[in-house]
Design a protein with these regions (language model features):
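Cross-family detector of peptidyl-prolyl cis-trans isomerase
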Residues: 1-221, 227-255, 261-284
Length: 284
């Protein structure tokens, strides 16, 4: 605990004093360091300046560069050798920034970590993993995307959703299906959630064509998905494809009473259908 000191004078300044590292236990000279894109296993504890523990994991597994953890942990881990124990003092710009993390990390709070690099290896390909592991990892990526989306970091959110979709597959290397009917259905459900979330992130990024394509991907898997129908109808209307937009929105409104979609989206669709009907009628 004495080593967990925010004012320690023997820090190695790595990035303009925003990330500072001190080795507590060095590894042998011939020990290796992980590379970008490899999977690492880290023992980690993070505290605020008042010593409140806000992050702790005795076996944190993540892939360097995939945004599974904050930037401070990625940057430090790639500098460590296997077996090394180090302190990392991270400015908020490399952790949780001006938003902090509810409910325990205030805005602009620096964090002090004690880290031990337990192991690292090449990232496993999704097609080599059992289906339950694919579902678990894919869902973790999706939840990380939700974390970024809520922070309005839409580029990172879209990246996380795409990585989740890469993981959420039931095929093998020879393109054969390897899942039970129940697993196949569960993977499909998570893919639909990821695709809907990805479309929302793409819209926030102004990627209208991509969002329309993603919405169509949702409807390929779930033709009665109301969120995707509303989004597709609105995007088609915005692009001037009025007849297809009207048919899509009509289908969404027909399904809507049995769904949880309410409020502004429904009002928008109702008035859009009226407007499109008038416009299309005037053409003939």
């Amino acid at each position: 605990k004495d080593s967990m000191d925010f004012k320690n004078s023997s820090w190695n300044h790595r990035y303009d004093r925003l990330l500072r590292k001190k080795v507590l236990q060095a590894s042998p000279e011939n020990a290796l360091t992980p590379a970008w894109g490899q999977e690492v296993t880290l023992k980690m504890q993070g505290v605020l300046e008042d010593r409140t523990v806000v992050e702790k994991d005795c076996k944190l597994v993540f892939v360097i560069g995939e945004g599974d953890v904050n930037q401070a942990l990625e940057e430090c881990t790639i500098s460590m050798k296997q077996g090394e124990i180090a302190l990392l003092l991270a400015d908020s710009q490399y952790t949780y920034g001006h938003l902090g993390r509810e409910p325990d990390i205030p805005a602009w709070a620096p964090l002090l970590y004690q880290l031990e690099l337990l192991d690292f290896r090449e990232k496993l390909e999704p097609l080599s993993l059992p289906i339950p592991d694919r579902i678990r990892i894919g869902n973790q990526k999706r939840e990380r995307g939700n974390f970024y989306f809520q922070r309005e970091e839409y580029g990172m959110a879209a990246q996380a959703y795409c990585m989740a979709l890469d993981m959420l597959t039931t095929h093998t290397n020879d393109s054969q299906r390897c899942a039970s009917e129940e697993e196949d259905e569960e993977v499909n459900d998570y893919r639909v959630k990821c695709l809907n979330n990805l479309a929302a992130a793409q819209l926030k990024l102004g990627q209208v064509d991509e969002a329309l394509h993603t919405s169509r991907d949702v409807l390929f898997l779930d033709p009665q998905n109301v969120k995707a129908l509303f989004r597709k109808g609105k995007l088609l209307s915005d692009k001037g494809e009025y007849e297809e937009a009207m048919e899509t929105l009509k289908k969404a409104l027909k399904l809507e009473p049995s769904t949880k979609v309410r409020g502004p989206i429904m009002k928008y669709s109702f008035f859009t259908i009226i407007s499109l009907s008038v416009y299309i009628s005037s053409k003939y």
